[in-house]
């Protein structure tokens, strides 16, 4: 299970969601400013920490060895997270994936392989 924090939209009952995936060595803390900067009142923001510790931050996969197993594991964890978001009322058609660096790779990996279409992929 991934560590997450939902920053609710200013508009009550909004079903629009942006899932934010940070880069190597960062964390969700590095993106707390994003909802305020975007100023989109209908947008809920889900900040997500990658699963692996990395020098005080987090990593989505091992950059020094074979990356494939880590990418696959993180993809599966993100699929589970997105399935839970769908169950909680956030349809994938109203969900954006946003990623930077390693988070961008995961955005593309998940966005192109998840069985449901997203509103958009941002990297």
Task: Describe the residue ranges of each PLM region.
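Gly/Ala-rich beta-loop-alpha elbow adjacent to hydrolase catalytic centers
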Residues: 98-103, 107
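Active-site signature of alpha/beta-hydrolase-fold catalytic machinery across serine-
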Residues: 33, 109-113
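Proline-centered loop/turn at the N-terminus of a beta-strand
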Residues: 44, 94-96, 120
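Conserved SAM-binding loop
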Residues: 20, 99, 123
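A short His-aromatic
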Residues: 27, 113-114
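Serine-hydrolase catalytic machinery in alpha/beta-hydrolase-like enzymes
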Residues: 1-92
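Short, conserved acidic/polar surface loops in the N-terminal third of protein domains
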Residues: 57-59, 107-110
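A conserved short beta-strand
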Residues: 116-123
